[in-house]
Amino acid sequence: MESVRHRIALLFANEADIQDVETVEDGVIVFPNSNITIQDRWTYAIDYELDSIRRISWRNPSSTRQFSVIESRLAPGFNIYSNDKEARLNLFGIQPVYSPMYKSLHSETWKSINEILPGGKNLNIPWNPELCDYDILITANTVQVFSYCSLVEKKKFVKDAGKVEIGLFHVDTEDEEDINLSGLRCTWEDTSNNIGKCEKTTLFYKPFHLYVDDSSDIAPITIENTNGLHPKMKIDLSGIRKDKDCRHFVFSQLPSEIFVDKFQSPGSIVFGLDDLELPDYKVNSLSWGSESIVTLKEGQINEITYFSRYLEPKERASNKTVGFEPILFKACQVGKEEDLSNPFYSRSLGYEAYFSENTKFYHINSTSVHVNIPYPNKNDIGNIEYTTFGIVVLAICYLIYKLLRPSRKLSTVKRD
């Protein structure tokens, strides 16, 4: 890496909490008096072309951290995206899912970033996947790393390699069009490790990710037949009116054990593993699963039907629990003249890529759902095989009998 610049932004719950920040000679000390989101942004300038990877994101699937106005809505898990159609993307020993917009790899567990980047480049970032989310955007000669964490204990921010400034913000005003952040911006001196004067600052921007309050009550998500091979997810939009500039969608990354039945789920698009016949133990080495995006209808309850794959038999009857987190959102078109760029996050590959640049995303609900898939009992396999074999033999014998049996001729009796 040739050079790095490091900026920090802290989002406080209110203006009063910023007053509790202590400014010392070499930095600032912040106390976790309320819910505080920390965004670290590292920008690396490099002098060579990177390969096909264009975005890497991580959000802990078990995280309960709430999204804030300074961050993008990341898909859960560890995700790698590429839009290079020529290059291969077969990390983790599995094949990617291909869609018209990108190819992707997904894992529920954290992977080493330094091992994924070309040449094993070390970014010298203190990764903390348990508590933080990450969004890494890669262009030809630049790597940008966005980190989002919650402040859980008192922390002192001091200068390190490339660190230039820290912003302390709170939401002054917010609506569906604009967000106004007010606060302080402090910079470190170039010639020393001391922090300079902190100045008042204000930021106006138009977000393209917005989060609806009390969302679980607006559009509840439920799952039915959770112990069968054909579970159904119901999304209740009966209380939502149709808008000519907006449509509702649900995006899901599904493990190999389950996939959307696109024939029974109108408006669904599925990429990846969707073979109806193959059991899970035949496909889980081929790819990680599938992606689906379903167009929903406002004013009614929407049903999405899934197929569960047959699992490898076990000695005793049991179930395997698999889960996923559908992302329910409303996508709205805005005027092309409206600038949706902002200093905190950028649009990139992922579900955002299915929509135009002038799209706003209103996130309504993201409820984790689970289904139980039964394991076949190994002890029953013999009986099933013998029964199936017997039925097949009887069917063949019956067909042979029908084919070889002498045909009856119809006779007529002439009456006098």
From Swiss-Prot:
A Pfam cross-reference name: PIG-X
Keywords for the protein's UniProt record, in alphabetical order: Endoplasmic reticulum, Glycoprotein, GPI-anchor biosynthesis, Membrane, Transmembrane, Transmembrane helix
Cytoplasmic side: 405-416
Pathway in which the depicted protein is active: Glycolipid biosynthesis; glycosylphosphatidylinositol-anchor biosynthesis
Signal peptide range in chain numbering: none
GO molecular function, one term: mannosyltransferase activity
GO biological process, one term: GPI anchor biosynthetic process
InterPro entries: Pbn1 (IPR042322), PIG-X/PBN1 (IPR013233)
Membrane-protein topology: Single-pass type III membrane protein
Glycosylation sites: 35, 180, 319, 365
Domain of life: Eukaryota
Ranges annotated as spanning the membrane: 382-404
Annotated compartments: Endoplasmic reticulum membrane
Entry GO terms, CC: endoplasmic reticulum membrane; glycosylphosphatidylinositol-mannosyltransferase I complex
Membrane topology (Lumenal): 1-381
PANTHER family, sorted: PROTEIN PBN1
UniProt family annotation: Belongs to the PIGX family.
Function statement: Required for proper folding and/or the stability of a subset of proteins in the endoplasmic reticulum. Component of glycosylphosphatidylinositol-mannosyltransferase 1 which transfers the first of the 4 mannoses in the GPI-anchor precursors during GPI-anchor biosynthesis. Probably acts by stabilizing the mannosyltransferase GPI14.
UniProt protein name: Protein PBN1
Organism: Candida glabrata (strain ATCC 2001 / BCRC 20586 / JCM 3761 / NBRC 0622 / NRRL Y-65 / CBS 138)
Gene giving rise to this polypeptide: PBN1
